[in-house]
Amino acid sequence: MPHQQILMLFGLLPVATNISTWWNFGSMLLACSTLQVMTGFFLAVHYTANINMAFSSIVHIIRDVPYGWLMQNLHAIGASMFFICIYIHIARGLYYGSYLNKETWLSGTTLLIMLMATAFFGYVLPWGQMSFWAATVITNLLTAIPYLGSTMTTWLWGGFAINDPTLTRFFALHFILPFGIISLSSLHIMLLHEDGSSNPLGTNSDIDKIPFHPYQTYKDLLMLTMMTTLLLMIVSFFPDIFNDPDNFSKANPLVTPQHIKPEWYFLFAYGILRSIPNKLGGALALTMSIMILLTVPFTHTSKLRSMMFRPFMQLMFWTFAATFLVITWTATKPVEPPFTTISQVAALMYFMFFISNPIMGWMENKIMKT
């Protein structure tokens, strides 16, 4: 395609002049997605979805396959980067009121659910000790569903316990779901460009827009370069920083790890699950911790879109961010006091942010009227 046509293609995307660095994470997510699909394909070529050979095949990839160690580490750490970017992307959407583009927000939340499912299936594939037990604990939550639970669990496992059929179907799902993510990402981007992205002020930016290229492309490239540098530094110097020590041992159904936990990016949801001493209640809280994002566009009552001029909401937002980190931290700790109490308080505060959002908006409107 000639240079002028490329310019015209990007020039057709007018964007607000005042969008900040927080708007760069969408393109970074696209880059992460591309990296995951490419490295995932080369890993799938050498991987064996069999409970007796899965762990050995990962060892084979790292030791014997040319640049296999690089592919495996890029894929594993790339997943962590993906989640760091998506959590910042969601936080920016909550802070600046991007959720008022309802279709874009709802498609994005669906993308998050698909991404979490894909990452969970991927975590099981190495068939290490923590992979096996995390899969056992999480899939067992289906049994909490009245009437259908046991049947659904047996169907998902492919038997009466996690075994070879479970690993095979998890591999199949881990392979196929990214294609759904790519399709939904395309829809997400199309829906975004229907109305155009918001800006930090939360105002209509139609009167003050600039072409996407060259301004935003270079801005995006800077952040992409920084992310790539960080990724390569971690891959080169700290490749096992996000790994669980238990996962370096092959899965053993007869030995339970002292403390079962999923990957770090699920710990906030796992912490909420553990904070409720009831199986069904915990499973519902776990589901609601993600699903509650779907309610945000419909509970916005403030006349201001962005939190930039809403000091009370800013305080609540940063309390929410701190709560997210606290739940993540408590989920890494044993189920004993004071961690159980801390996680219960933090879980309550997590949900209180979404509940008090409309009340705070209504109060702000009252204050502005007086």
UniProtKB/Swiss-Prot annotation:
Its cofactor is heme b. It is a multi-pass membrane protein. GO terms for biological process: mitochondrial electron transport, ubiquinol to cytochrome c. It is found in: Mitochondrion inner membrane. Heme b b566 binds at H89, H188. Keywords: Electron transport, Heme, Iron, Membrane, Metal-binding, Mitochondrion, Mitochondrion inner membrane, Respiratory chain, Transmembrane, Transmembrane helix, Transport, Ubiquinone. The chain crosses the membrane at residues 25-45, 69-90, 105-125, 170-190, 218-238, 280-300, 312-332, 339-358. One of its GO terms (molecular function) is ubiquinol-cytochrome-c reductase activity. SUPFAM superfamilies: a domain/subunit of cytochrome bc1 complex (Ubiquinol-cytochrome c reductase) (SSF81648), Transmembrane di-heme cytochromes (SSF81342). It comes from the Eukaryota. GO terms for cellular component: mitochondrial inner membrane; respiratory chain complex III. Binds 2 heme b groups non-covalently. Heme b b562 binds at H75, H174. A ubiquinone binds at H193. The cytochrome bc1 complex contains 3 respiratory subunits (MT-CYB, CYC1 and UQCRFS1), 2 core proteins (UQCRC1 and UQCRC2) and probably 6 low-molecular weight proteins. Belongs to the cytochrome b family. Component of the ubiquinol-cytochrome c reductase complex (complex III or cytochrome b-c1 complex) that is part of the mitochondrial respiratory chain. The b-c1 complex mediates electron transfer from ubiquinol to cytochrome c. Contributes to the generation of a proton gradient across the mitochondrial membrane that is then used for ATP synthesis. Heme 1 (or BL or b562) is low-potential and absorbs at about 562 nm, and heme 2 (or BH or b566) is high-potential and absorbs at about 566 nm. This is Cytochrome b.
